[in-house]
Amino acid sequence: MAECGASGSGSSGDSLDKSITLPPDEIFRNLENAKRFAIDIGGSLTKLAYYSTVQHKVAKVRSFDHSGKDTERDHEPPYEISVQEEITARLHFIKFENTYIEACLDFIKDHLVNTETKVIQATGGGAYKFKDLIEEKLRLKVDKEDVMTCLIKGCNFVLKNIPHEAFVYQKDSDPEFRFQTNHPHIFPYLLVNIGSGVSIVKVETGDRFEWVGGSSIGGGTFWGLGALLTKTKKFDELLHLASRGQHSNVDTLVRDVYGGAHQTLGLSGNLIASSFGKSATADQEFSKEDMAKSLLHMISNDIGQLACLHARPHSLDRVYFGGFFIRGHPVTMRTITYSINFFSKGEVQALFLRHEGYLGAIGAFLKGAEQDNPNQYSWGENYAGSSGLMSTSPELGPAQRARSGTFDLLEMDRLERPLVNLPLLLDPPSYVPDTVDLTDDALARKYWLTCFEEALDGVVKRAVASQPDSVDAAERAEKFRQKYWNKLQTLRQQPFAYGTLTVRSLLDTREHCLNEFNFPDPYSKVKQRENGVALRCFPGVVRSLDALGWEERQLALVKGLLAGNVFDWGAKAVSDVLESDPCFGFEEAKRKLQERPWLVDSYSEWLQRLKGPPHKCALIFADNSGIDIILGVFPFVRELLLRGTEVILACNSGPALNDVTHSESLIVAERIAGMDPVVHSALREERLLLVQTGSSSPCLDLSRLDKGLAALVRERGADLVVIEGMGRAVHTNYHAALRCESLKLAVIKNAWLAERLGGRLFSVIFKYEVPAE
């Protein structure tokens, strides 16, 4: 913890707190490397954005020179590993109460050393009020930006870059949040910003929008009238009162006016006929809770009706709501959603945003950074440094509520290359990567959260073992353990905190936390050793395959693919075997496989297809290093090449578990080419192309792939997609519909999942699909 700001006397009301203790490692991370700033100051909350460079360790591989050596008998590693420092770009967003603003500015001033700019972009109603204070403290010139332009730029940015950013609120569901998949075409839409008043904007493109309406009755009205009615001055306390109120004690309902005759009008008797109608005639005192609830309903219903009236003439069916009025409060989202559904008769969808509070700050930052072209990159949410969507529902326990109104964080990492859809997706807007939504499935959620928690000891042990020469590896590993454990506890209480909860998001969060504490590739030495062993076995495996008849060889190739997929250090059932039995190899893995018929078995259809004309080009998403890629995937690739099929072999851009990376695949392919003329000529003639996916995940999102890979798929006319492994073909993409033939194959290495699918440990999925005509 560090002192933030000079000590001073206590403050209250609108005065600024100058004596606040902040944890800078958690709040203002990488501030010393901040290059550019933006700030959005509202009536009660400040949102700060800054761009910084982050230095972290990465594991690099480089091929040895094996010229003139006998590679079959050469027991040296196939490549060397070095850990290097790499600098990447990161966006930081921090949200805090205006009470903290002077203390935070003092802290920033004391720690700001490398900024490249003399200007800070500012937006929001408080930009004018605090202009002099900001310029005095930071010695940066304040450039004020248009509020609406910033909001729209920010909204477009999060919808494009953050999967599961938008959600609908359904009060009777468990959980109430239903997240939307990223739509490749987000325009047009209606943005309703509820600040002090209401602004309604039609957004047509990234640069074109039109203000179409608004109202003076908005969040400020709720706050102001609420303060008069309840004597409660704080906005969140008003919402807390409303959540405990019963509006029908104050409002006149339809049944109060029409009695039983309301049914002939086609109206529900519970509809509000007159807000605060009973207060004019009832001779009684109304509770603060009931009045706050009635006021919230009145304003939310008005906003919902206005949104519908403006959406319909423009034929818009999606309305995004933002502004300080919402703040993720369930009672607010519930009333707005009900209003939209009622007045639109279900034709218009009310959508809320996980990061709606940051839109203005994000937009202001983008305005100031236009010369750096931030929109030409793709960005990804860093789960390790983000606090997530923390509901302020009064039903939550005090541990969860305590975070409301303090500091919330969002971090986004700039990715090396733009990410786009796989061109072969049948219907990109309806594509959902994940097979099971753990926010929906309570039993699966409980199992997987416990599974990842119980695996922590092994992950920590592996991380420490990967850096034997580091004096602080154990200390950093314990910090990783604590951070990831805390994330898991948050997700137990609030599974919606980072969007849709899935096995993929749990795996990705773990990878982010490992990277946070400089464990870039804990399995690098394991992969190096296993690649070396598998390369020495490759010639013998190929000779035995070539000796088989054609039909027998096809089955052997598929079994080789499946046996290779057994070697997954992310599966406890496998890692236990590999650690206890160092001699466990390719043949032993084959004997572990389920006998045919498999759990999902389309092999006969695949064999029949192979008797037809060859495919033009196959896109193969590989899984693990070592035996999997070398003895399973490459013989399969070789057979396709012999049939006259071009092959695009796609591997992870960065490390995750023991998955093969693009840089490792290049070295492996080079070594195999030295042993096999088929692979050698295919590489030379560019009939075999090795590309990176743009991902560093054990799973696969076909809507976020490297732009170069997508271009190559179009250029080569790929007509077969092969997806291998549990993470890529079962946890994700099992139901993915493609416009071409596909193979999804995996060995189920988790007993609980196998039983749930109707099988047993090491059951086989071999799913061959042909698109409908």
UniProtKB/Swiss-Prot annotation:
UniProt keyword annotation of Cytoplasm present: yes
One function term, GO molecular function aspect = hydrolase activity
The chain residues annotated with the modification 3'-nitrotyrosine are Y320
Q: Which residues bind acetyl-CoA?
A: S196, S199
> Which reaction(s) does the protein catalyse, per the Swiss-Prot or TrEMBL entry?
(R)-4'-phosphopantetheine + H2O = (R)-pantetheine + phosphate; (R)-4'-phosphopantetheine sulfonate + H2O = (R)-pantetheine sulfonate + phosphate; (R)-4'-phospho-S-sulfopantetheine + H2O = (R)-S-sulfopantetheine + phosphate
Question: Where does the record place the modification Phosphothreonine?
Answer: T406
What the entry lists under CDD domains is as follows: ASKHA_NBD_PanK-II_Pank4
Similarity-based family:
In the N-terminal section; belongs to the type II pantothenate kinase family.
* Protein's recorded name: 4'-phosphopantetheine phosphatase
| Species of provenance | Pongo abelii
